Regions:
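Carbohydrate transferase catalytic cores enriched for Leloir-type hexosyltransferases
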Residues: 1-318
């Protein structure tokens, strides 16, 4: 999105600031002529900018004339899905950003309401800008009897209940989990190891974008029963790839999925299992959801995100 902002507004000058652990990787990307990159070394910078936009809940600890913070989610504050140390650090950063930022961008209306409720931000300062979908290579191939889940192996992603629900699905089907190990993964992997359906469950770990596109293209069902999401990008990626989607009826997921997915109570293995069985048994249901999902995904573009972000910039700059 940053390059898109610079490319669509050649009249403005942009400086993309990276903390040390991201600076070297940033050189892989080519920037528009009106943008340059620099190392963000607090407390020396950034200085001299009319507006600073921080892309997460952490603003530099220096005086900024005008600033925007993007907040993606607050589950670290509101739930026990991370270590106490990380929760304390995140909470301090989010509260600091909410108190100092001229405006806040939330990636969903759900996150906007959380920012207002938990960080005390005035409603007029918090703007919703939905993400666009990243461009993944299209993998056109025959669908297989595979249920795919994409995301970290962690408690928040509700993998243990997904495994329990999968155990009720016809034995012709496989469950494929694509994502790195996260908080609470040991318990989840132990649950998979003792599952009676364990031989039909594949844990891939982290996979490349190319491999991910391949699995989106191969799966016949995409299941994402997460307990808490500030947005839910995998839902839209699966829809864009033509996969029928099952997801949770809470957090930002209904906002993102609309009427193009089966929505279930993620804390009910029975409801989740029934939805999986319905999807695996009915090709008509899968076809209907795939068609609606493809149309839904087209609403979330980076062009829209760039326009909405620039509108917030204009408001802040007056």
């Amino acid at each position: 999105m940053l390059a898109g902002l610079a490319a669509t507004h050649p009249e403005a000058r942009f400086r993309f600031c990276y903390r040390a652990h991201r600076y070297l990787r940033s050189w892989r990307a080519t920037l528009p002529r009106n943008a340059r990159r620099s190392l963000l070394a607090e407390p020396l910078g950034p200085r001299g900018a009319d507006l600073f936009h921080g892309l997460n809940q952490r603003l530099p600890r220096i005086a900024l004339p005008r600033s925007i913070a993007t907040i993606h989610d607050l589950f670290v504050m509101t739930s026990e899905y991370s270590t106490p140390e990380f929760r304390a650090r995140f909470t301090e950063q989010a509260r600091d950003a909410a108190s100092r930022a001229t405006a806040i961008i939330a990636v969903s209306e759900f996150t906007r309401q959380q920012v207002i409720a938990h960080l005390g931000a005035a409603p007029g300062r918090v703007h919703v800008v939905h993400h666009g979908i990243r461009a993944l290579p299209r993998a056109d191939r025959p669908r297989e009897p595979v249920i795919l889940n994409v995301g970290a192996i962690q408690k928040r992603k509700n993998i243990a209940r997904l495994v329990e629900a999968f155990e009720t699905v016809n034995a012709d089907w496989r469950l494929v989990l694509a994502g790195s190990a996260g908080y609470g993964s040991e318990e989840i992997l132990a649950r998979i190891a003792r599952s009676p359906a364990g031989s039909r469950i594949s844990v891939l770990g982290y996979i490349s974008a190319e491999d991910l596109a391949g699995w989106y293209g191969r799966c016949s069902v995409f299941a994402f029963p997460s307990l808490d999401e500030g947005f839910g990008m995998p839902v839209l990626e699966a829809m864009a790839a033509g996969a029928p989607v099952l997801t949770s009826n809470r957090s930002a997921l209904p906002e993102v999925a609309g009427d193009a997915a089966l929505l279930v109570d993620p804390e009910s293995p029975e409801e989740l299992g029934k939805a999986l069985r319905d999807l695996t048994k009915s090709e008509d249901l899968r076809r209907d959801l795939a068609g609606r999902g493809s149309l839904r995904a087209q609403l979330f573009t980076w062009e829209n995100a760039v326009r909405a972000t620039w509108d917030v910039y204009r408001q802040v700059l007056g």
